[in-house]
Amino acid sequence: MANIKVAVVQLSFNDNEAENLAKLESKIIQAAKNGAKIILTPELPSYLYFCKKQNSKYFDLAKTIDESPIVKLYKLLAHKYNIVLPASFFERDGNACYNSIAMIDADGSIMGVYRKAHIPDGIGYQEKYYFSPGSAGFKVWDTKYAKVGVGICWDQWFPEAARVMALKGAEILLYPTAIGSEPHLPDYDSKDHWQRVMQGHAAANMLPVLASNRYATEANDDITATYYGSSFITDHTGDKIAEADRSGDDILYATFDFAELQQQRFYWGLFRDRRPELYDEIVRKY
């Protein structure tokens, strides 16, 4: 299918889930009415980023996929507006919790769930306390409009994940994100590095990349962090073709002909000339 319009939504969030969901709904509808068929929103957008510190009260936010308010909302919106809409949510499954994506196709059906594989554990990003790592591997979904691969935030720093999704047939890579300041390094700004690593995935795999980040300063549990927005879209060469500011609500748009991009990947020969027999070290633990 030629000329598919995609969108990236950038927003700020607070501690009121209903308000956050209303903001998301408004922007998703706006993007859909402007012709977007695949729409990406940030990581865990129902709440403030609660992983700054370890606090057991936040486990009350975890819901099963059937209970999750954001999954319910996104299913309704996907069906009504005929859009592909990945839903990032705090998933509870039995006694375990995950940082998950429910991939929702344009008919409102859930195609499957991806659970974040790479879980950070640093100052201001205490995710290992909250989330078990996903172990089912990286997934690509054959949606109505494109074959879509999704990594969640810290996954975006690992080229292996992007390459696996490309080898599984992904035509576009999506990265919902929550990234900003480092509380122990107040003068450090990772924004450019963050963008470049995903631009590299786009260029190395000749796939467009969408990255959606939250923005604004959030203070909870006696710790403050500023999320720097700067959401962006790249083309298949890694060139940024749309970018949001460090703050402010925004919707970014781009249009891709995925059949044409497939021909360019064939022409360039990156996958033809791979030498997997030489890459054993990549899968070893050192």
From Swiss-Prot:
Disruption phenotype: Deletion of the gene results in loss of CTU activity. Loss of the gene does not affect acellular growth, but it impairs intramacrophage survival in resting as well as gamma interferon-stimulated macrophages. Mice infected intranasally with the mutant show significantly reduced bacterial burden in the lungs, liver and spleen compared to wild-type Schu S4-infected mice. Mice infected with the mutant succumb to infection, but they survive longer and show significantly extended median time to death compared to that shown by wild-type Schu S4-infected mice. It catalyses: L-citrulline + H2O + 2 H(+) = L-ornithine + NH4(+) + CO2. Pfam families: CN_hydrolase. Is a good candidate for development of an efficient and cost-effective enzymatic-based method for preparation of ornithine. Residues 4-258 form the CN hydrolase domain. Gene3D superfamilies: Carbon-nitrogen hydrolase (3.60.110.10). It is an enzyme of class 3 (hydrolase). Its EC number is 3.5.1.20. Keywords: Hydrolase, Virulence. GO terms for molecular function: citrullinase activity; N-carbamoylputrescine amidase activity. The keyword Iron does not apply. GO terms for biological process: putrescine biosynthetic process from arginine. InterPro entries: Aliph_Amidase/BUP (IPR050345), C-N_Hydrolase (IPR003010), C-N_Hydrolase_sf (IPR036526), N-carbamoylputrescine_amidase (IPR017755). The active site is at E43 (proton acceptor), K116, C153 (nucleophile). Catalyzes the degradation of citrulline into ornithine, carbon dioxide and ammonia. Contributes to intramacrophage survival, in vivo growth and pathogenesis. Belongs to the carbon-nitrogen hydrolase superfamily. This is Citrullinase. It comes from Francisella tularensis subsp. tularensis (strain SCHU S4 / Schu 4). The gene is ctu.
